[in-house]
Amino acid sequence: MTVIVLSGPIGAGKSSLTGILSKYLGTKPFYESVDDNPVLPLFYADPKKYAFLLQVYFLNTRFHSIKNALTQDNNVLDRSIYEDALFFQMNADIGRATSEEVDTYYELLHNMMGELDRMPKKNPDLLVHINVSYDTMIKRIKKRGRPYEQLSYDSTLEDYYKRLLRYYKPWYEKYDYSPKMVIDGDKYDFMSSEADREIVLDQIVDKLKEVGKLPMDWDKSTDIQIEA
């Protein structure tokens, strides 16, 4: 059985690819809930006040998601606990968290990762990272249409988004919980183009074959013309 986790910045297309990939492989998608997150709008309205609360909220939900996914062992997750510290550390670096909040956050994360390490299946089987440029990121954020994510909502978001993209390169290089691969989200518009979608799916299947984690009962005849 196979557990795949996705990563990538806001607007990269993680949720769309999660749905496409889970249907293609016949596995269960795990989506991070955003629209009913009570803290996220508060964070965008007052980032310094709510950065710690938001990250603890996400950390808790991501912990439960990865535990369930590793237990069921047949899933695709659109974001995971392995990516969590990237966001909090970035907010801490720009003064949105106190030293006490930083210490508390990392203690919580350490305890949760320790619990995962005691599970029968400890890690995912593959990380699929979607790499996008700033322009692609903003284009998809506009298309998604969440008001509090738009540049017009807050003039500081441009710097925040550009900084976030810079944090991803070292994070990906250091990630070592599983095999990993990169999808070029600028080159392949898997959300709108069926041809690009097929290329991306083929890339992921090839990687799963390489690491010996392609589901044994997978049928390549599965229709990939999925509405993302």
From Swiss-Prot:
Pfam family, one: dNK
Residues noted as binding substrate in the record, renumbered to the chain: E32, Y44, Q55, R79, D84, E149
E.C. numbers: 2.7.1.113
Signal peptide feature range: none
Top-level taxon: Bacteria
Binding site for ATP: G8, P9, I10, G11, A12, G13, K14, S15, S16
Subunit structure, interactors included: Heterodimer of a deoxyadenosine (DAK) and a deoxyguanosine kinase (DGK).
Role summary: DGK/DAK plays an essential role in generating the deoxyribonucleotide precursors, dGTP and dATP, for DNA metabolism.
Protein name as annotated: Deoxyguanosine kinase
